[in-house]
Regions:
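Class I SAM-dependent methyltransferase Rossmann-like catalytic core
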Residues: 24-62
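A short beta-strand submotif of the Rossmann-like class I SAM-dependent methyltransferase core
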Residues: 162-165
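A short glycine-rich, Lys/Arg-flanked "PGG" loop and its adjoining helix->strand segment in the class I
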Residues: 175-187
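A short acidic, Gly/Pro-enriched loop at the edge of an enzyme's catalytic core
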Residues: 147-160
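Conserved class I S-adenosyl-L-methionine
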Residues: 62-73, 190-215
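Short alpha-helix
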Residues: 224-247
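S-adenosyl-L-methionine
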Residues: 107-146
């Protein structure tokens, strides 16, 4: 698919009040990205393990409260964190993406892998999604939610993680969101953010490169300072980065 077609489609979907449903239909019936494949589930599992490793390295607590920014359509990472043994997971997204059938697909993979018991409940057609997630999986679904003002208590969270979300956030909002993260995170807590700087349209159009700026500017672009936009506001909020600012 030409990336311009996807850009146009996403723009058109956003013009309608039911654009979210159209987008969901398109991902199920046109692009085939939903429901998530086993490969996609395994990618999410690997990503969750990477965040878990950061938590263990910089301050692990068995009963820590976890907060995810950008939980998406199927809650794969939140469910995986449940399987790690975390009893209380806050899953926030600005859009009410979550669909019961997509959550069930992840639960199915997890049962196949023996990460959760076979008798762990799925979400029925008329099931209360939020109640089942809370009661059975310890997931507090915060959708639609506002990461700038979560309503959570100060210093109530042990761990925060986010996977390929912050690159979609307007730069002027990042300091506000990070300030809220700092407020809710315990002073010895850990925040783990994975930022993907590659062009997300590369997945559907191989005629573009993962880093199109390099293709456009060629030898004239010696270095892109990728982490400055995040590290500077994070440090200003009070965070202590455990990696140096870098570039490519």
């Amino acid at each position: 698919m030409n990336f311009r077609m996807k850009c146009l489609a996403q723009t058109v979907f956003g013009l309608f009040p039911w654009g979210e449903e159209i987008n969901y239909w398109a991902q199920r019936n046109l692009s085939g990205t939903l429901p998530p494949s086993r490969k996609r589930y395994e990618q999410k599992l690997a990503q969750a393990l990477a965040h878990q490793e950061a938590f263990r390295k910089y301050g692990f607590r068995e009963q820590g409260v976890v907060y995810e920014i950008g939980c998406g359509w199927h809650l794969a990472m939140a469910l995986v964190f449940h399987s790690f043994g975390y009893p209380d997971i806050k899953a926030l997204d600005v859009n009410p993406h979550v669909r019961a059938e997509l959550v069930n697909s992840i639960l199915g993979y997890m049962k196949e892998d023996h990460r959760i018991p076979k008798e762990a409940p799925l979400i029925g057609p008329d099931g209360d999604v939020q109640k089942i997630l809370r009661d059975a999986y310890g997931i507090d679904l915060m959708v639609p939610g506002d990461s700038r003002s979560t309503g959570m208590q100060t210093e109530s969270i042990d761990y925060i993680y986010s996977q390929e979300v912050f690159e979609h956030i307007a730069p002027e909002l990042i300091p506000v969101i990070l300030a809220e993260c700092y407020r809710v995170l315990k002073r010895d807590g850990v925040i783990s953010l994975y930022i993907c700087y590659s062009d997300h349209y590369f997945d559907v159009d191989k005629s573009i490169t993962p880093l199109p700026l390099l293709q456009i500017h060629g030898d004239g672009l010696a270095e892109i300072q990728l982490s400055t936009a995040l590290c500077e506001p994070a440090t200003a909020c009070g965070f202590s980065p455990v990696f140096p600012p870098g570039g490519v």
